[in-house]
Regions:
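C-terminal/domain-edge helix-coil "capping" segments
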Residues: 291-299, 354, 370, 376, ...
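Non-catalytic, mobile gating and regulatory segments of ester bond hydrolases
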Residues: 24-178, 182-294
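Sec/Tat signal peptide C-region and signal peptidase I cleavage site
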Residues: 19-23
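A short, hydrophobic beta-strand-centered structural micro-motif
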Residues: 299-304, 345-371
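Bacterial N-terminal signal peptides
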Residues: 7-17
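A structural "domain/chain start" motif
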Residues: 212-214, 286-330, 425-433
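Positively charged n-region of N-terminal signal peptides that target proteins for export
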Residues: 1-6
Length: 433
């Protein structure tokens, strides 16, 4: 690859380095023709396409959490916490070239693994991107792939903990390989490596990636299309197409789903946190679509009413708020209806009444920077309000306040919500009046 091409690619990749690359002023539209895939919002159309690719919305959401957690930064704290609170053991790893995590737990008597590879975060990651020559796979000389990604996949595939995860699929275990951007490309090639070696049961393996670049030739693209591998992209994300600027032979995973955003957004739509938001919305939509739309419930849980002075993208805030709420699993013994739409208190009461709910849980949350702090320290104030829906009366409330450096303030919120042992019972409400 020419020096000028390498320089241009390096500059553009730096624009998207790491999960924090989010706030940019201008909307960037791709100059490339669209792939032969539909552009869909995360809803029924997306769910149908995921089903054809052999994955479901819960697997995509787990992969999104793990892919963000693979970044070794302050942004990874809440996704790691969320995975741990839902039963996953999270173990970080580093080959000296690639960072990754392995999340594992036992489900239905069999091991379940999620292997997530970090995207571009360090200078060494940038070097891997710039090793842009195409090399052939020894077992399949007609397949050519990105050299830097293939070398990374080879190193990771040889790790004993990943070999153990793959081997478990022969005895009922399951594995998801995932990653964002560079990590997505490497995860896909690990899957291709396992296909070529037949080391595990392919029916028990999934590859779910986010913003993986074009990194294989047409033969490789067709080979990827033969196993359960799906790549998610954003409609206006330029970065996954960059390699095709310097080598027209590069192609993408044919099982690609291009998401149009369910909420308006500006800037480069490449950050992993944006994919987490869309994956959460997809899972919430799927969950809600399978619920009965009528019938009484005991409790109606409205989406938190969040105000903030953090100076961040509203969608970034929304993603982390949703993550905190996802981690807060309310008791299953109650008949509960949840809502993820933002609304005013009056609308929440009206919706709760329409569902026949007795009580409404309303969570006003305020996040603010600590003005006197020289570091990025934030405070959070939360009021947990329980309302009588019919009377529109506030029955009881409880306030809490937290402070934290950086965005781990959202992990504090999740810790508080998950730490609640029970929902107040009717007798507790009566004692308050």
């Amino acid at each position: 690859m020419g020096r000028m091409h390498a320089y241009v690619l390096a500059v553009i990749l730096l624009l998207g380095i790491g999960p924090q690359a989010w706030a940019h002023d201008a909307v960037m539209l791709s100059p490339f023709p669209a792939d032969e895939v539909s552009i869909v919002a995360p809803n029924s159309s997306s769910a149908e396409m995921m089903s054809k690719a052999g994955v479901n919305s819960n697997e995509v959401l787990l992969a999104a959490y793990a892919s963000l957690a693979a970044y070794q930064s302050e942004w990874s704290g809440l996704p790691v916490s969320t995975l741990q609170k839902t039963g996953w053991q999270v173990t970080p790893g580093d080959t000296g070239h690639e960072r990754f995590i392995i999340a594992s737990q036992e489900m239905e008597g069999h091991p379940y693994y999620i292997v997530a590879i970090s995207g571009t975060e360090r200078k060494i990651d940038l070097k891997a991107n710039l090793r842009n020559d195409m090399v052939t796979i020894p077992q399949y000389p007609e397949i050519s792939v990105h050299q830097g990604y293939w070398e990374a996949a080879q190193r990771l595939s040889e790790l004993p903990q990943i070999r153990e995860a793959v081997a478990s699929t022969n005895y009922g275990g399951r594995v998801i390989f995932t990653g964002h951007s560079l990590g997505g490309g490497v995860a896909t090639l690990i899957g291709l490596q396992e296909v070529s070696e037949a080391a595990g049961d392919l029916a028990q393996m999934r590859v779910i990636t986010f913003a993986a670049p074009d990194f294989v030739n047409s033969f490789g693209s067709r080979s990827i299309g033969k196993y359960s591998a799906v790549n998610f992209r954003m409609e206006a994300d330029l970065i996954p197409r960059l390699f095709r600027l310097v080598n027209y032979r590069y192609r993408s995973n044919p099982n690609s789903i291009t998401w149009s955003l369910h909420t308006p957004s500006q800037g480069i739509q490449h950050a992993m946190v944006g994919f987490l938001d869309e994956a959460f919305y997809q899972a919430a939509w799927t969950f809600s679509a399978n619920l009965p739309t009528s019938g009484p419930v005991d409790i109606y849980v409205a989406a938190p009413a969040l105000t903030t002075d953090m100076g961040l993208s509203p969608r970034l805030i929304q993603a982390y708020r949703n993550t905190a709420i996802y981690a807060a699993v309310l008791p299953e013994t109650q008949r509960i209806a949840r809502d993820y739409r933002e609304m005013e208190l009056s609308d929440a009461l009206a919706t709760a009444r329409a569902r026949g709910a007795k009580y409404l849980l309303w969570l006003p949350i305020s996040i603010y920077p600590e003005r006197e702090s020289t570091n990025r320290n934030y405070g959070m104030a939360l009021t947990e309000q329980w309302w009588d829906v019919d009377k529109e009366e506030l029955l009881t409330w409880e306030s809490a306040a937290f402070r934290s450096g950086g965005y781990t303030i959202f992990a504090k919120l999740a810790d508080y919500l998950v730490g609640k042992e029970q929902i107040p019972g009717e007798s507790d409400f009566l004692l308050q009046n």
